[in-house]
């Protein structure tokens, strides 16, 4: 696999293809417009997304599902450091890790979806609260996988509740957080290539992600978000 060098891979591409995959699992098509990525450390420009749920959506976990929808155009940064194209194995390994995480806590993620109470006005607060709690005690690959899976849950829930435009914002928030808060850690720990080497198909299963701690963090963050919402509504 080609080495990305110090600048690393394009986080926006990684986010967009992951969300595309998670929506494809639920039978939604994701058409991505001509969107340029923002440089590292800057807020990216929102994309142009459209969602068309199939008449009879059938969940699927096949890795090639995303390829059946409209292809993603290459994402090239207009300014800032030149980013390397993301190798397919990075996307596949991240999907595998996310699927493993969601299988282990399928019931908890279902409960999380019902507790999010997403609206156009609460979505950013929900995202910020959970992500802040998730990385409060530091960063590791397990928490990064949980970050992607949580973003996927938010996107699916947004489409389920007929709030598809929220996915634009969620993709932007995820990319911005990766660029500003996680990119340095990822590069200092070998980049996404190291993630593939550690958790690729031929390596050990993803059993060292501190699943219970992640579950507790996500639950605590959701409780905090609900308390905050209750306090806000109490003053309305």
From Swiss-Prot:
Membrane topology listed for this record: Single-pass membrane protein
Which NCBIfam families does UniProt cross-reference here?
A: bcl-2 (TIGR00865)
| Record's comment on post-translational modification | Phosphorylation/dephosphorylation on Ser-70 regulates anti-apoptotic activity. Growth factor-stimulated phosphorylation on Ser-70 by PKC is required for the anti-apoptosis activity and occurs during the G2/M phase of the cell cycle. In the absence of growth factors, BCL2 appears to be phosphorylated by other protein kinases such as ERKs and stress-activated kinases. Phosphorylated by MAPK8/JNK1 at Thr-69, Ser-70 and Ser-84, which stimulates starvation-induced autophagy. Dephosphorylated by protein phosphatase 2A (PP2A). Proteolytically cleaved by caspases during apoptosis. The cleaved protein, lacking the BH4 motif, has pro-apoptotic activity, causes the release of cytochrome c into the cytosol promoting further caspase activity.
Q: Which family does it belong to?
A: Belongs to the Bcl-2 family.
Q: Name one GO biological process term.
A: extrinsic apoptotic signaling pathway in absence of ligand
Q: Does the keyword Cytoplasm apply?
A: yes
Q: Where is this site: Cleavage?
A: 64-65
Kindly list the positions at which Phosphothreonine occurs in this protein: 69
Its domain description in UniProt is: The BH4 motif is required for anti-apoptotic activity and for interaction with RAF1 and EGLN3. BH1 and BH2 domains are required for the interaction with BAX and for anti-apoptotic activity.
User: Which residues does UniProt assign to the signal peptide?
Assistant: none
Residues that bear Phosphoserine: 70, 84
- Gene transcribed to yield this protein: BCL2
Judging by the UniProt lineage, the source's domain of life is Eukaryota
In chain numbering, where does the motif BH4 fall? Answer: 10-30
* The name this protein goes by in its record: Apoptosis regulator Bcl-2
Location in the cell: Mitochondrion outer membrane; Nucleus membrane; Endoplasmic reticulum membrane; Cytoplasm
Gene Ontology cellular-component terms for this entry are: endoplasmic reticulum membrane; mitochondrial outer membrane; nuclear membrane
Q: Where is this motif: BH1?
A: 133-152
What the protein does comes down to:
Suppresses apoptosis in a variety of cell systems including factor-dependent lymphohematopoietic and neural cells. Regulates cell death by controlling the mitochondrial membrane permeability. Appears to function in a feedback loop system with caspases. Inhibits caspase activity either by preventing the release of cytochrome c from the mitochondria and/or by binding to the apoptosis-activating factor (APAF-1). Also acts as an inhibitor of autophagy: interacts with BECN1 and AMBRA1 during non-starvation conditions and inhibits their autophagy function.
The cross-references to PANTHER family, in alphabetical order and at most eight, read: APOPTOSIS REGULATOR BCL-2, BCL-2 RELATED
Q: Whose protein is this, by species?
A: Canis lupus familiaris
Q: Return the motif ranges for BH2.
A: 184-199
For this chain, the annotated S-S bridges are: none
TM ranges are: 209-230
């Amino acid at each position: 696999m080609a080495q990305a060098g110090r600048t690393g891979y394009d986080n926006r591409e990684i986010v967009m293809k992951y969300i595309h995959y998670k929506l494809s699992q639920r039978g939604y098509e994701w058409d991505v417009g001509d969107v340029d990525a923002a440089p590292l450390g800057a807020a990216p420009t929102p994309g142009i997304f459209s969602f068309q749920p199939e008449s009879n959506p059938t969940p699927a976990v096949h890795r090639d599902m995303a390829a059946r929808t409209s292809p993603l155009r290459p994402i090239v940064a207009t300014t800032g450091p030149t980013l390397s194209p993301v190798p397919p194995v990075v996307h596949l390994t991240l999907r595998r890790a996310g699927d493993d995480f969601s299988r282990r806590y399928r019931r908890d993620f279902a409960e999380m979806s019902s507790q999010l109470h997403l609206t156009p006005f609460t979505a950013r607060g929900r995202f910020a609260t959970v992500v802040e709690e998730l990385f409060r005690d530091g960063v590791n690959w397990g928490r990064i996988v949980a970050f992607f899976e949580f973003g996927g849950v938010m996107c699916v829930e947004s489409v389920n509740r007929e709030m598809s435009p929220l996915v634009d914002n969620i993709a932007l928030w995820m990319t911005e957080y990766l660029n500003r808060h996680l990119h340095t850690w990822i590069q200092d720990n070998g980049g996404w290539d190291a993630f593939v080497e550690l958790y690729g198909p031929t390596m050990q299963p993803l059993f060292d992600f501190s699943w219970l701690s992640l579950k507790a963090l996500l639950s605590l963050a959701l409780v905090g978000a609900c308390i905050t919402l209750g306090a806000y509504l109490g003053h309305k």
